[in-house]
Amino acid sequence: MKNIKLSLLDQSTISKGDTAINAIKHTVSLVQKAEEWGYNRFWVSEHHNLASIAGSAPEVLIAHLAAVTQNIRLGSGGIMLPNHSSLKVAENFRLLETFAPGRIDLGIGRAPGGDRITASLLNPGNRFKEEDYIQQINELQLYFNDQVQTQFGVVRAIPVVYDEPPIWMLTSSGSSAFTAADMGLGLAFAQFISAHGAKQAIEVYRTRFVPSEIFPKPEVIIAIWVLCADTEEKAHELKQSLLHIFLQMEKGEVRNGIPPYDEIKDYPYTLQDRARMEANSARLIAGTPEQVKEQIINLATDCDADEIMAAAITYLPEDKVRSFELLAQVFGMI
């Protein structure tokens, strides 16, 4: 059997009737459990102007997570680079490296993490051009290598640290696989966003990969929704709830937080709705522990991934916690 590492991604989602404060508290509690259960890394996301997600500043949240953990790797999944100055991102993650030496990952992406208007307010200079994103990545690497030269001298990202956080490039379309390979970065494919394309993107990445100091060989993560439950009935409820949330997000109708299953179980779906839900099923893995284990092994083997990063959205925080506990158990981590 392929040796698969398991990690977690959390977005600090807000359930209907709950608060953002509690959502962040649940994330903090979850990272401690993830460390106890033996997960390899724990990443948090960047989203803006979304009523159902509290995680807007991963660099701030990671600092707190570092203070309550000892060994687990912590990172961003990801920093949406066009929203930020490359220098400021380099400084933020070097500072995080001083809090948790050897435990920080910098996952970067080019999506806005919200709507285009909000992205423009975050960075009024954002032209939404791919070439600008590539330039920012180059700048980021130069800052990490203390090689940014201006007419007035070298500009350094402070503080200077012994080890730089590894850069992971996030992609959901596969286009960034070329860039990640050419630059010698890690690749994280977001199958939780895009149901298809992981295998092709990873093949391109591994074929083109140019070794770098931090990544002497290609490394691949696939991030996917994982819902693991004690019974098939419970797994079905969690899956249907998540598919409903996807549908509402696509329609722009998630305004009051994540709803409970009882509220949506009799929803009058149209034929088009059901078709979308069926298509979105490929973005997730759901079932009992053994069923989930088989699907994860098949996914990692088929796509040649080194690591699976599990994410989950549930109305009850304890359902998410139980899901990840069962996942750790079935893989023999606890």
What are these regions (language model features)?
Residues 1-2, 62-70, 97-103, 147, ...:
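Acidic (Asp/Glu)-rich catalytic clusters
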Residues 1-69:
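N-terminal beta1-alpha1-beta2 module of alpha/beta enzyme domains
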Residues 2-20, 83-147, 187:
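Flexible, glycine-rich active-site loops centered on histidine and acidic residues
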Residues 6, 38, 46, 65, ...:
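Conserved, mostly hydrophobic/aromatic
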Residues 6-10, 42-44, 74-76, 104-108, ...:
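Hydrophobic faces of well-ordered beta-strands that scaffold small-molecule active sites
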Residues 10-25, 79-87, 161-171, 280-289:
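Active-site mouth loops of central-metabolism enzymes
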Residues 127-156, 197-304:
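An alpha-helical appendage that flanks or caps ligand/catalytic pockets
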Residues 177-196, 201-202:
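A conserved active-site cap/scaffold subdomain adjacent to cofactor or substrate pockets
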